[in-house]
Amino acid sequence: MREKYLLHCPGCGRLFPDNYTLDCPLGCNALLRTVYAEHRLTLRDLPGIFRYSSWLPIEGHLRIDAGPVSYASEGLARELGLSNLTVTFSGYWPERGGRMETCSFKELEAQPTVLRLGEKGAGVLQISSAGNTGRAFCQVSALTGAPVVVVVPASAADRLWTTVPAPNVCLITVEGDYSDSIAFGREVCSLPGIVPEGGAKNVARRDGMGTVMLDAALFAGRLPDAYFQAIGSGTGGIAAWEAAERLVADGRFGSRLPTLHLSQNLPFVPMVRAWEAGRREIVPEVDMPDAEASIVRVSADVLTNRHPPWEVRGGVYDALAASGGRMYAVANDDTRSAGRLFEATEEIDLDPAAAVAVASLIRAAEEGFIGPDDHILLNVTGGGYARAAEDLDRYPVEPYLRVRAGEAFAGDVRDAVRGWLAEQEVVVRA
């Protein structure tokens, strides 16, 4: 292979070059994967996430020093009776080297995605988000000047801020929930020049998140026995599985895939219900009855994706099945108590979604799903908000447009976005 990497479709087995490709050209219902020329992980002398660029679908790098940070837990590990607990932290914690200024692991996705589009495609990225992903892409836009269109629920608008001004962001707020934002974002991409970020289909997003597994394995010198993360779409779980398979093929980190322990926040737990029923399909009326009311009641609303990549080839179901995985439904009270325990023992505050993962770890330890000497990886997907508020400037991203639930992307709304796009002076692929 002369190229750094190719894309592989697990449906038909075809290999092909990347042109910011999100789907198999033959129409397979499968998530494309990257196949890298380097089968052994080689570290680069580059900042942040880009030290792992040999296994990222990019050619260059950004001058952003933000990546995952792994360390051996003492306080939480002692509290839970675990002798080998590795925490990989993605957030703001300068004493530990954590420099994700938006306090979320979504920066691991945003950095390589923005770079990949610039290298392999053309146009302006569109991102639909419940808050954290949108904030991460706004931050990368602020630091690089890359224009982005971000669509979020109106209730999440206050989560959109950056640590330096972000003049190249078109923020659209939608009355409704995360799924309404996804639907409207899809319509925005009908405008020539606006490109969907791709979600789980985006290999840069998954491989960026996969650096959590790479960082932890390098720190511990081996793959973990068990991996804990809270999920909304489940893309992070897929990313962990894919990265672990690459590390197994590398040969230096062990031959056994980690068991995935993935969690959702009650009462919105469609993937938990489908998994416990042994179903590859999510049945909305069974797995997420009264979805809107359930979404309103969760503590971690970033975990409320109504259309996760569950049944697709290479999706969440396959990741759980391949690893002998387990899922957890975590109540709000348990989430809050887990967050307090982590802050008391590890001395940093958590994002609510990360607290869901901690709660699942507590349950697994109490119920014997993991052993005291097992090597455990806890993926802390966000935290350090209090410290960031003390140390960093914060610039709110003001909405460019506000739209009603169900409003069509037409007329004045479409014209406004077209006008913004014209001001960006970006290359638009014919």
Swiss-Prot record:
Top EC class of this enzyme: transferase
Molecular functions per Gene Ontology: cysteate synthase activity; pyridoxal phosphate binding
GO biological process: coenzyme M biosynthetic process
Positions carrying N6-(pyridoxal phosphate)lysine: K106
Source taxon at top rank: Archaea
Positions in coiled-coil regions: none
Record pathway: Cofactor biosynthesis; coenzyme M biosynthesis
InterPro entries according to UniProt: Cysteate_synthase, TrpB-like_PALP, TrpB-like_PALP_sf
Cofactor(s) listed: pyridoxal 5'-phosphate
EC number: 2.5.1.76
A Pfam match: PALP
Entry binding sites for pyridoxal 5'-phosphate: N132, T381
Gene3D superfamilies to which the protein is assigned, alphabetical: 3.40.50.1100
Catalyzed reactions per annotation: O-phospho-L-serine + sulfite + H(+) = L-cysteate + phosphate
Keywords, sorted A to Z: Coenzyme M biosynthesis, Pyridoxal phosphate, Transferase
Function comment: Specifically catalyzes the beta-elimination of phosphate from L-phosphoserine and the beta-addition of sulfite to the dehydroalanine intermediate to produce L-cysteate.
Database matches in NCBIfam families: cysteate_syn
Subunit and partners: Homotrimer.
HAMAP family per UniProt: Cya_synthase
Family note: Belongs to the threonine synthase family. Cysteate synthase subfamily.
Protein name: Cysteate synthase
Annotated source species: Methanoculleus marisnigri (strain ATCC 35101 / DSM 1498 / JR1)
